[in-house]
Amino acid sequence: MSLRKELAKEIQLLEGEMKELESKRMRSLSALMESLISKRDPEETEMQFFRQYTAEIEVKREKLIELTEKLKTLV
């Protein structure tokens, strides 16, 4: 398989993974917002999940940028 096709496939996989992580992060964000609106302390686990998902998204976003740049140089 050509390098361009491999990069395009990997980019597509990363985008899917990021979309899934963003959905999970949105659920945690909703729980955190509910706590804020209800004027109560947020659950520690929700804060940890939010931070974890955010960190994973950032790592994948950096990888996506890197792969996209590589793909642009091949075109």
PLM feature segments, named:
Residues 1-23, 48-55:
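Short, charge/polar-rich alpha-helical segments
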Residues 2, 57, 67-69:
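Short, low-complexity interaction segments enriched in Ser/Thr/Pro/Gly
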Residues 10, 30-31, 45, 66-69:
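A periodicity- and composition-biased signal for non-globular, repetitive helical segments
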Residues 17, 24, 31, 56, ...:
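Interface faces of extended alpha-helical assemblies
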Residues 19-51:
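Short E/K-rich amphipathic alpha-helical oligomerization segments
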Residues 61-75:
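Long amphipathic alpha-helical coiled-coil segments
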